Amino acid sequence: MFTPQGKGWTGWSTPAPANQRSGGGAPAASAPLGKGKGTTLRVAELEQELHEYQYNMGLLLIEKKEWTAKLDEINQALTQKEEILKREQAAHLNAISEYERREESMRKALGVEKQCVTDLEKALREIRGEIAEVKFMSEKKITDAQSLEASLEEKRLEIEGKLHAADAKLAEANRKKSQADRDLEEVEARQRRLEKEKLYFENERKAGEDRIKRQEDSLRDWDKKLKESQNRILDLQRSLNDREERANENDKLFKIKQEELEEAKKALEHTKATLKIKEDDINKRLAELHLQEKEAESKNRKLEEREKKIAEREEKVSAREKVGLQKLLEDHNVKLESKRRDFDLQLENEKKSFDAMLVQKEADLVQREKDVRSSEEKLSKKEQVLNESKKKLEEWQNDLDTKSNALKKWEESLQNDEKQLSEQKLQIENERKQAEMYKLELESLKATVVAEKEKILQEQNNLKLTEEERQEHIMLTAQLKKEIDEYRMRSNSLSEETEDLRKQRQKFEEEWEQLDEKRTHLEEEAKKLNNEKKNLERWHDNEEKRLKDREDELDIKYKEQGENLALKEKSLIDNIDHQRLENEELLKRERADLQRNLQLHRHELEMEMEKKQASKERELEEKENELNRKMDFVENELKRAAELNESKIQKILLEKKQLQKEKEVLVEDRQKLETDKADIRRDIDSLNTLSKSLKERREAYNRDRNNLIDIFEKYKVCKNCGVIIFEGLDALALKDSTDIEYPSLAVEADDRSPNPDTLAQETGALVNSGGRLSLLQKCSRIFKFSPRKKAEQSSEQQAVKNTDFGARLEEASQSDDDYEPTPVYQVAYNSFDAEDLPSESGAFENEESERQDIADDVQMESSLGVADNCVDIHGTQSFDGNTDMVVDTTIVDVDQNGKDSAVLPVVDLEPETSKQGRRQQNRKGRAKGGVKRTRSVLAVVEDAKEILGENLEVKKDDGQGDSVTVGGTRKRRFAGATISEQDEDSEAHSESVSLGGQRRKRRQTAAAVTQAPGEKRYNLRRTTVANAATAAQTNKKKAAKKGSKQTVEATADDTEGTSKAEEPATGSKGASQSADDASQLPEYSQAEAGDTHGPVEVTSAEGVDIVDGIDAAPDAMPMTPSGSELGAEQDDEEDDDSERRNQSIGKKLWSFFTT
């Protein structure tokens, strides 16, 4: 500030005393005149001093006004800045809310796109299923066509044979003509079928075209949706970039305002320091001017030091700015390099994606080019936003890659469809060729007929026929004419059919041409895409050039900024020098003024200055406090805004991480889908192998069935006595040949069975039980056993449903590997051929079980005899709802050596709970064998009673034989089985044979018993050593049955009959066994009323000398305890109903056969 220069100070004026004379010796008379002059001078001086004081006060007032104006301006600037801060905060909050809303909209768009992807995947799956169905139908039709071809060839051969026979016999010509007519009718019917099949193929082709069109429409809609979503994304990116630009501009404004505030603070501090210095100087100048000068000098020194510090600070700031500029340049260069790499990667990805895109993406490419150009224009302003925008573009490109892969798959499916159409065309051409062959054959037939006609004419000329023969010949010729006319009609129809086939061929050729046109169209589109690739490469080069130009521009800008900073530094130094000079001038002026004014009115000025100082200090303190408060408020608000921005940035980063995680999850889901597809393909292959194995087994079943039919026809009548063994076989042998059940080919018929849980069970059961036992089922219809209920099957199915599909396939493959034909047919065949061969019990699952359980496995031995020829057939039928029967049969005959051996079926009636546990270990479809009684069986027993009479009653009373009754409960089973080893001169090998295709592994844990002398543990060979009494063994087995679980096996003791006289080889080692062995009655014991059924074994043998159950065999001890002994513990719980049910079916059958 400039102040006007006042007058120079003239020094202090002291008034002269009244007595002092000023003239040095003047007279007294001159004294009044001197006083007047002194007063006038004094008044003038006082007036001058007053003027000077007024002048100085005016100067002070002017300075005061100026300071107040400056304070008002600063206050206004602060208020304006506060308002601007509030507005910017409100705008920032609005921008954040809009950003959140757009993020929500983006998420919704992503969800919609995910739904579209899932819908497309579902559509692809449906298309593949339809393709599989079409393949399956085509394979079926191919097999039908092949069968038709075979039948047509056979018939053709028959027609040729008949035509050759017509030359020899004219009488048979009519028959052959009629047969030819029938064959032609069949050919016409087959041709009609072929026409229907052609129509069906055409309809299917049209339906396929419609589906393809629908798919194309859906893909077009999907592309439109994609375009819309891409446009939305680009709009959102633009808005985000605008907001980020605004935020950057606001940050720059904040920085500028902070710098201005700092400068204002520095100015205020400087002014405060100067004011304090002035006040101190004024207080000290009043006391000592010299001290003021020294203080001024010290202040000058301090100012110099401060100037030095300021210079040092400015140098540090300039160095920092240079370092910061270098860092910024380096970071900018690194970012540019990373951006270049990202652009390169993006361009490569875009090239890969554009290779698979179609013409429909041209509009998208144009829009993308425009968007990229706009984004490039914004890159110069938004260098910090490039990373985020690039990540979003990469995500979008990944989506495009997935969609392009889907389109590739769809194109592959279209190619497969084209291949199928070509195959169908070839098939139709083959059919047309076959029709032409048929036409040629008909023409050859016509030629043969004409030749026959000529031969007949020659014979007429050669032979002189009678009138009757002539009439017959005329009739024959008329018939031949009719047949010729019919052949002509048929040939015309065949020509029409050939024309239709030609028309169809033309249609197919037209369709093929359309497909060729489509291919050319696709090739053109590929060329367009290549051109677009070239354009993109050019665009990439242009972008690189632009980036280089921008880098140069940025370098120029940075240089200009450095120059501006240097100029600013110079201007600051000049301003500091100017202010220093002004301060020096002010000090000089103040010194002069103070030297003038303070010497005159020291005390007045002191009082006034003290008051003024106090008031000014108060005002300054108040203003300083207000300024400090405002600055603190502004700083706090700026900190809060920075914290809010940081928190929002962190939220955005977290959301980006979540999106990346979702991408990874989608990739994992796709990989899982691919693995599932591979597993499904493997399952399909395994099912095809199973279907082939089932076909082979069906052929084996047919062979075995034919062998059985041959055996039954050979041995329908007994060789010795001529008695008919199998009654009703003639009625059942061929009547129900159409009812023979084959194993179901459910796996072959449909790869997607509606009930896959029961697949392994059905395949296992049907493989072993379907085809071979049809005749045995017919034989078993004579006995009319009651079928099993469906509850057993439901329990089995519930146990199997919990298994996986892969496990059931493995089990089915294991059952294929373990398959062996059942030994019943070998037993029957060998028994009739009088060969003693022990049959195998079945295929065990483990070799160790075969080694450990040889003693417990039951063997069957068949032997022939002369005494009596009898067949003991014990059959059990189990119906499981699908009319699948399981029959247990045993065939008994008499050995040539005169020994009877009974093949004893063991009926397994274990509780269902235990069977379910066993099925969970071995999940193979096994049918249960059960015996139940129906009214038909009771009627048979009543008939037997009427015939036999008293003998039957005696057999009912005799209940102590070799039969065993076993009661089983749910918690434990009473093992009351005793294994009969050897009687005196007979050994019985019994084997449980289940003809339901099931070879069960039976484990029998027998209690440890002491062996009697001459007794053998295992029935492996024939022995003639007599057994001692085994009553002790039975008692021990009764004691051991409480802690062991066994299945009952009772072996009947074979005895010699009346064949001793006829065959002396047997000797007289044993007597005929009692009728206990023949009329043995198995009993059913129930531990809990009707809950469970124990296993029942029937021992039945027939001898010739049957007198009494006690007197006939005095030497033979019973090998097994009687049913009454074992059932003594359970008689209290049995009811009358259980006693009625416990009658022996074997006895009824024996009584039936004796009738």
Curated annotation (Swiss-Prot):
General function of this protein: Architectural component of nuclear structure that plays different roles in controlling nuclear size and morphology.
Localization: Nucleus matrix; Nucleus lamina
Coiled-coil spans in chain: 120-316, 372-704
InterPro entries registered for this protein in UniProt: CRWN
Extent of Acidic residues compositional bias: 1128-1137
Main subcellular localisation: nucleus
Keyword check for Ribonucleoprotein: no
Taxonomy, superkingdom: Eukaryota
Record field: compositional bias (Low complexity): 1023-1034
GO terms under biological process: nucleus organization
GO-annotated cellular components: nuclear lamina; nuclear matrix
Biased composition, class Polar residues, residue ranges: 11-21
Source organism of the structure: Oryza sativa subsp. japonica
Protein name (record): Nuclear matrix constituent protein 1a
Family in the record: Belongs to the CRWN family.
Basic residues composition bias: residue spans: 916-934, 1035-1044
Record region (Disordered): 1-36, 293-315, 910-934, 953-1155
